[in-house]
Amino acid sequence: MTDSGPKPPTTPPEFEGFRYRSLLRNYTTLSGLALAGIALANIIVLAIIDVTSDRPNPYTGLLAYMVLPAFLAVGLILAAAGIWRERHRRLVAVSGDPMQVKIDLAHPTHQSRLIAFISIVVVFVLLSAFGSYRAYEFTDSTTFCGELCHSVMHPEAMAHDHSAHARVGCVECHVGSGASWYVKSKLSGTRQVVKTVLNTYPRPIETPVANLRPAAQTCEQCHWPRNFWGAQLKVFNHFSSDEANTPRQVRLLIKTGGGDPDNGQATAGIHWHMNIANKVEYRSDAKRQAISWVRLTDPRGNVTEYTASGGDLGANDTIAVRRMDCVDCHNRPTHKYNPPDHSVDQAMAANRISPTLPFAKQQGVQVLTAEYKTTGEALEAIATKIPAFYKTKYPEAAKDRKGDIESMVSELQRIYRENIFPEMHVDWRTHPDNVGHYYYNGCFRCHDGNHKSAEGKVITKDCNSCHTVLNQEEGVLPAIVVNVALGFKHPVELGDLTSVNCSDCHNGGVGP
């Protein structure tokens, strides 16, 4: 009897003699699958570590999202190449037609393999999307910028971690938002990577950064110039280099000023330079430390040009005319390397170095400013020279105040680690801070009394233009930190109402 029912599909004749599964059985494909499998396993493990870790390791992110995915891709390409080559060889052997490719969706085997292939592709695309996003996040992280190239960026990373902007990511200032600056930063970063690999990068890293994004697009996202006004009290503590470390305190009222006409201080204070109605331009050398020419355009459009006397206009200029913005004064808002004199003063004012140790200021500054080839050599010298000084000059102090001397050594080592980097030739002298004028020219780059206009106007050097000295005293710091304050004098005699709260009368509306 003949069965007239439907027959299950059979293997097409062109595929007789081999099965797809056997296409994996070649050295190229097996090698590619092994490489891809190992890479994928490591990616999964490292990604889990990276996601669950409180403090990601820079090398974990580098391997998980950048290095290992490249090996995974190479492995998959090798596997595909091996399958194609094996299939090509067998088709030629069976039919003589290497281009013969047929997929029969009515065939159960073809259906299952197509579904499996599509599923693998979908999973791979999803994993690739996750990995690509994590790679993007990683390359924008402070960990990537500051810790991956440890020896190169160590000074910048250390300064960032101890700055007022420690919680602000590198890209917030160096890149900002938007695709165009992101692309520019990555292109610039590629050039820097090449220099790092070839060991041709400058030591120290050159500043100011060329083509840095304008401060109006970065700094002003948080520090809006229209919301600056008034004055600030600044207290400066200094210690002399004598045996007693004689303290001296200077109190200044810094005339910060502002740029908001609504507050009635649109033309007052230091931030007059950044007033939205004023335009200050200048020419200088590449380091922006020697300014030869200044042009001021006031709110009415009047233009005044000032030229430094005693030199030709632009003789040493290497940059084009630049409009003044935040970073022309605040040029070290994050990567600041404090001078030893300032650092030791702060440590003594905070009693991290005892001010009662003889010659503590002198010895601390001397040991920090000495020349060393490596950080390790410097730390060892600090640990040796300070105890040796007191043992030789003040044997009783060396014996009775051993704890204070050890604390001094520890603090000086901390100061050195955070501010001086001999391997990269970085210290306070290589990166001047333009805020103020105590250790660097800063304000005096323009306010030196030598910049004159054709009409005879001179950029002022009057100290009181920017700050007012409230008092200067010498003595024991705890005695001079607190000054006697004057009692508030009410404009109207209150009589028996002196104990009444201000808000009982002043309600914000019509006065009493």
State where each predicted segment sits.
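Extramembrane terminal tails and long inter-domain/linker segments of multi-pass membrane proteins
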Residues: T2-F18, V92-H110
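Eukaryotic non-globular interaction segments with acidic/serine-rich, low-complexity composition
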Residues: T2-R21, K373-A388
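Hydrophobic alpha-helical segments
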Residues: P6-R89
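Polar helix-capping/helix-linker motif
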Residues: Y20-T29, H107-H110, S141-T142, S163
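Non-ligating segments of multi-cofactor redox enzymes
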Residues: S31-V45, T60, A64-V67, V74-L78, ...
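Membrane-interface interhelical loops and short amphipathic "cap" helices
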Residues: I49-L62, T143-M153, M158, H162, ...
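Juxtamembrane/interface segments at transmembrane-helix termini
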Residues: A81-L91, G131-D140, D345
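C-type cytochrome heme-c attachment and multiheme electron-transfer modules
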Residues: Q100-R134, T143, V168-V171, V175-Y337, ...
